[in-house]
Amino acid sequence: MIVRKSPREIEIMKAAGKIVANSLRLAKEIASKDVTTDYINTEVEKFIVRQGGIPIFKGYRGFPKSICTSINEEVVHGIPGQRKLRNGDILSIDVGVGYRKYVADAALTIPIGEITAEAQRLIDACEKSLWLAIKAIKSNEMLSIISRTIQEYVEDN
């Protein structure tokens, strides 16, 4: 059952989302050659806490860090560690924040330095398909329509 949120609840949800968005911006600024994903985790965690948020991944089912990081072909939801980022890496970061009983979660793909044309094409296709899917969302729209929008664009590009 979907419960409508009050204007106050929506404002709190927006605030949680803003903390996530700004956390991802910070991660993107920090992520560069020779930086470890553990360092990114530490800085993002400090930022979240300063904003009054709670990094919700930390401790969830034993997860030891505040953000999820995956480099290149690593499976999503990787644990930040001491590996230094290298030129050409593709870094995926997932951030989840609890704020006043609500949760926001988002992910971002960050190219490190110069990446291959193929990698950039894949990143671009994924981002474009996201915006097409958002545009396709309408009240009472079936999820399959949105999923098809994503699939068709990615397969064609």
What do these predicted regions represent?
Residues 1-157:
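Active-site neighborhoods and metal-handling regions in enzymes and metal-associated proteins
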